Structures are given as structure tokens and as C-alpha cells.
Amino acid sequence: MKVLGLDPSTKTGFVWLEDTDGESLHVVQSGEISFPGEKGMTRVQSIGQRIKDDLIGFQPNLVVVEGYGFANKHTLVTLVEIGTAIRLALHESGIPWASAAPTQLKKFVSGKGNMKKDGIMLEVYKQWGFEGTDNECDAFGLAALGLYAGCPDLDPHLKADQRKLLHAWKAENLRLFI
């Protein structure tokens, strides 16, 4: 199974994970998408096109996108523009996708719904050995959530609280796993 995790922001983090042996997660590719100097609808169009052209070319079984966070009202409009461009590109491409709220991501990775970015980075490294930017680590957690949901054989590797959140998230997105 191939899963893409996306952390929408002005530097959108992405991580491709595969379950290659039924026992571990394999990082295919990771990075950030940004368009310095572009603003507004030009940036929205560029992000949507990049998602269609580059990332969807991997033909993922599932894409997990971080849901909208409402903590910073100053960046909310920009994040909604970027998030909408990503979701529209996925919809137009017919790629199955699901959203995970920021608190769900944090609880899955760390067991705490209010973990800061540097804490998420540390937890991702400790549990899975992945190092990257804060955006890439969020994307890793999202991709891992989707991969564990789609590959029950990986489930024993999770802690009890991770398993609980995973099963609740999977129930919310059951249409993707039937």
C-alpha cells in the first residue's frame, strides 16, 4: 500500500510511505512544496498543478491531508486557500483522500493533542527514525496514520493509545477502507 501524507502550508510538507514487507514503513520520498514570491490565486493554482503533476504521479492508494487549524487567525485565509487547492486537485484526479484534524495527528504521534512542532519532530524520530522539517514530520505522521489504517498487520507495532486513535479515525473514514 502507498500513502501520501500532506501538511498544507506555505511550505507544504509531503511524505510518501509504503508498506513493503508487512512489518515496517518505508519512506519513498519526502520534501516540501513552496512557491516563494507567489501569492493569492497564483500560488493556489501553482500548488494545485504541482499536486496533480508530481505527487499524484505516484498513484497512491490513499492521501491523508492535515485538517484546518484555527489557532492563528492571521494565516487562516492563506491556509484555507492552499488546503482547498490540494483537496480540489485530489478530487479532480480521483485519488481517495481523508482529512485528519491537527489534534488527531498529534495524539497519534505523541499521545497528546497539544504537542508543539518540535515535540512532534522528536516523537516521529524516536518511533520511526524519520528526520525532516516540522512540515515533513507532520506529513510523515499523516501518512503513517493512513498506512496503519490500511495495513492491519502493522497494528501490533503501535502503542495502545495510538491504536485507539487509529481505530476511531478509521471508523470516521470507513468509506476508504471497505
Q: What are the residue ranges of the model-derived segments?
A:
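Phosphate- and other anionic-substrate recognition elements at nucleic-acid/protein interfaces
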Residues: 1-178
